[in-house]
């Protein structure tokens, strides 16, 4: 979705249709990927589909860690490089470990878009801090 394009309403309607058919949907609510140091501000417009269909939201966090116990800065697809450039870097990169944390699902029942976004934001921030404490070397 390009910012300012008006596509988010179209995409939200498509997501709502898929959720009504019980298809799972995966997206980055930060509207981007990050280097894994922090959770950026979430954009909640697409979460409206979960509210409209009373579908729970399943937060999942990933961080890439070097053998030295530090966050890896090559694996995350960030910045301005093309996917092909990124893939080339990843394939040439030494081994790293991807740590995945699946947080408890969040019920969308009783939430509006803003309250669901705020709750998801807080749970993801808390979860990332816990994941870092578990897998990173001080």
Residue ranges of model-derived segments:
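Generic beta-sheet signal
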Residues: 23-29
């Amino acid at each position: 979705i390009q910012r300012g394009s008006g596509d988010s309403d179209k995409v939200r309607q498509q997501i709502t249709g898929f959720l009504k058919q019980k298809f799972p949907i995966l997206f980055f609510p930060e509207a981007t990927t990050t280097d894994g140091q922090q959770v950026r501000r979430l954009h909640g417009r697409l979460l409206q589909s979960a509210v409209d269909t009373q579908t729970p939201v399943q937060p999942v966090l990933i961080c890439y860690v070097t053998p030295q116990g530090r966050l890896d800065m090559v694996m995350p697809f960030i910045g301005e490089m093309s996917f092909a450039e990124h893939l080339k870097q990843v394939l040439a990169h030494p081994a790293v470990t991807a740590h995945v944390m699946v947080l408890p699902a969040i019920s969308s029942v009783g939430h509006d878009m803003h309250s669901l976004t705020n709750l998801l934001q807080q749970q993801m921030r808390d979860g990332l801090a816990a994941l870092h404490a578990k897998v990173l070397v001080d």
